[in-house]
């Protein structure tokens, strides 16, 4: 008769290295011994097969998944829907790769070991609610805004080098008037440089006009989504729809995964990083975090410095103490991050009350 130890179910941890078309998984037992490896396609059936494979090995205590915001997003959602614990894992550091090399199996094993060691404690974004809708619309808007700017810049460049008659007709006009005028150009047969310039300007102007309408349409959808997702956030001084949307995307649909003001500040790159050694106690700037969220906080601070008397008094007080303007702005960004965190938590805990 087998002992009790032999009758106990094996407890395993699974690490997954994610890619566009295939995921590679490694399962470790509770002692860190490699139990099995596999690979599955990134399809719904592949996700089901991977989950069945893991459950067939024993009791799954947790999953370490790389790229839960990109290639691993679909798998993370599937595992969460099956009520499995998923941890977000960053790629192995350079020292690990120097020692063990780089392969999908090595990365998957490192992900599993990160979970067992408690290093991978991050909770992935759920990607299932209004914030995910805001995220995808913001991607489309950012692309449209970039092309919108490129179109008018290209038009200005062409106008500078255009034949004199055409250049003089368009010089000094505002952007809307330049676009309107260029949309009406008639190049005719492309037999001269002037005709070619007119043809190019008309195409760029029409592109600019179409992108303007596209941006307006996206803004019309983003505004109600953002206001509904975090009404208290949009009431903060200096927080507009675009800034609020970016901060929501950074926090995710499940901001409760951020356990404190400090964790949100670190995520936004506004928390100082300790750099002490021996008897020296010092901190350095945080160059990490979500730089788009950091930029959003910066915009809020700049607006408040221009229009909020309390912020202006704080700036005057700290500069009188010897702080530079840049140093004071860093302090203000941290204060704003705390306000944003409180607003996000209120909306997440009780959206009806926040509204």
Give the label of every model feature segment:
Residues 2-29, 111, 144, 246:
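Gly/Thr-rich phosphate-binding beta-strand-loop-beta motif of the actin/hexokinase/Hsp70
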Residues 21-45:
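Short glycine-rich, Thr/Ser-proximal phosphate-binding strand/loop in the N-terminal lobe
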Residues 45-62:
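Short, basic/hydrophobic alpha-helical segments
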Residues 47, 235, 241-325, 353-354:
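Phosphate-backbone recognition surface of nucleic-acid-processing proteins
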Residues 59-71:
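Short glycine-rich phosphate-binding loop at a beta-alpha junction
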Residues 80, 86-126, 132, 182, ...:
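Short alpha-helix plus adjacent loop in nuclease-associated cores
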Residues 137-232:
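Glycine-rich, often acidic, oxyanion-interacting loops/wings at catalytic, nucleic-acid
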